[in-house]
Amino acid sequence: MASFSSSDTVMTLATRFDNLGDWTVEQQFVLQMGSSYLLAHGIGTPLEKDATTTIEIPQDGNYALYVRTKNWTAFWSDGKTPGIFQVLVDGEADKAEFGTGKVGSTRRERAQWYWQKGGTYNLKKGKHTLALHDLMGLDGRCDAIILTKADIAPGDSIEEYKVLRQALLPEPVEDKGIFDFVIVGAGMSGLCAAIAAARFGSKVALIQDRYILGGNNSSEVRVGLGGQINMAPYPSLGYILNEIGPDRIGNARGAHHYQDWKKMDVILAEKNISLFTGYTVDGVEMEGKKIKSVTAVEATRQNRIKVSGYVFSDCTGDAHLAVMAGAETMMGREAKSQFGESLAPEKADDYTMGVSVEWYCEDWNTPCSFPDSLDWGLRLDEDTIEPVHRANWYWEVGMRDDQIADAEKIRDYGMYVAYSTFSYCKNRLAKKEDWECTHLTWVSHVSGKRESRRIVGDYILREQDLTRPIPHEDGTCTTTWRIDQHYPMEKNSADYPGEEWMSYGKLVPIDPYAIPYRCLYARDVDNMFMAGRDISVTHVALGSVRVMRTCAMMGEVVGLAANVCVSKKLMPRDIYKTHFDDLVALMKKGAGRTDVPYTQFYHQVDRTGHQAEDR
């Protein structure tokens, strides 16, 4: 079987370009499509600065150009995609427009990542230049470029791609050492876990796939904090969140609103925390039923590292670490008969709460234009349009998709709806003159997730635990949010069957409830904790525990428990069996500072249903 070799082929990763210009590094979907990539996220304005690099051609000859890309709108439209760009070789633009899509019989096939063929170039041995030139500012994307003398085309499957990468771009793994506690994911739960463990003396590795900390509460996603902290039975839990959480309420506000610097400053001040930002964990080494180490790939340079540890915590939200380690997970809705929950459906299904892709526009004094999405965008009219200036929580997509396998599609649909909505208001709305000076200021390209996989622990929290309530002897931090489940709006579902993008919340009140410790460690991976929305709960119970202040306190508990494990040479389950009093003592103390201003008074109760602020 013919294959590529470094003697006749040059492969260049887009994120490794010498100068990225105005292109954005996108690393959310490494586990689905095999790599981080460059995204032309210009929000409707073509990127001004190209991404450029210099390559070394090994020998004279004719080289065929291949570009790994995709047509991101092909899932929903047969029209010409706006996600197109050019590739320049030695300053000459290839005749092809890249990102136009794979040939296929279904929309899913046409929307897959593939190698698009360009022209053939006669190149001399030595240095040559490549450039990516965006054409629309609407999220064209490039993963890699190949120039080859070989008379074969690269395969499109993820398996073929991995083999190709290993052959042409082998990457050694740098060993970063052994830690007491390794945390994967630096959202609010991962941050609080790291801080709690570090302050009680554990050596912590905190691995985050993005360069910004905070997850959904970062300036990349912009979801406000919800839930209450500092509640009985352990009112000291939550002060860490008060240190790192923003002091302002609201979704989809300006970047400064989310005070990313507070999170980073506190983490960097902890001498026991080693922070690895931009790293996606993509592999584990097991020793029996214990995780021995994880490997991770960096988003921009795509170098690889290995991190070993004594205990680990999955704070990814998606249970990525758990799945790699072989832990049992759940996803979708459990049947009523499985746990006896009144709010569960009669039959189990794959439905989940969806993703919010936040955005907003602003009225300025200057007129502006925006590309008309009539050819490629969402089908909208005066009846279906939502002419708002801000997308809040109820702009929700992907409820019927696979939250893991379809993660990129779901995010893309959120952007697709945002662009289509704004384009309609600018170009076709009956009162479009009201939008003449309205600018689309910000559209997130990072998914604001609510639900995906949940890890099975020694106890699975159920609806009845929260509503009766049923207390447990190993209660820890307190959940206070009502059981808040989201469903597609009926009219939106009728207008866009299977592709809904508007939701409503269905609420069931609860009293404050202490989450059992047994929900915070995996049943079948001996040294793995979890904190955040991937803990051991049913779909129904997740409706309460998933909000970020509650997740943050879970992280604090897990950090304290990790310290007990490290100091007494235990595994997580051992704490429940024989050393829960040691954890209780630490939960009574908490790990947060009480000498900083207390700001977490806002949005302590669920305001689901309040939509007027966004119009």
Regions found by a protein language model. Give the residues of each.
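Short, solvent-exposed loop/turn and secondary-structure capping segments
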Residues: 76-79, 99, 141-144, 156-159, ...
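Membrane-embedded transmembrane-helix bundle of lipid-linked glycan/lipid transferases
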Residues: 182-184, 285, 289, 309
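Conserved beta-strand elements of the Class I
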Residues: 180-182, 205, 529
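Beta1/beta-strand and adjacent pyrophosphate-binding region of the FAD-binding site
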Residues: 175-187
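N-terminal Rossmann-fold NAD(P) dinucleotide-binding loop
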Residues: 190
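Extracytoplasmic
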Residues: 2-170
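Flavin (FAD/FMN)-binding glycine-rich loop and adjacent Rossmann-like elements that form
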Residues: 168-175, 216, 240, 278, ...
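Conserved N-terminal/central alpha/beta ligand/cofactor-binding core
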Residues: 196, 202-203, 208-287, 330, ...
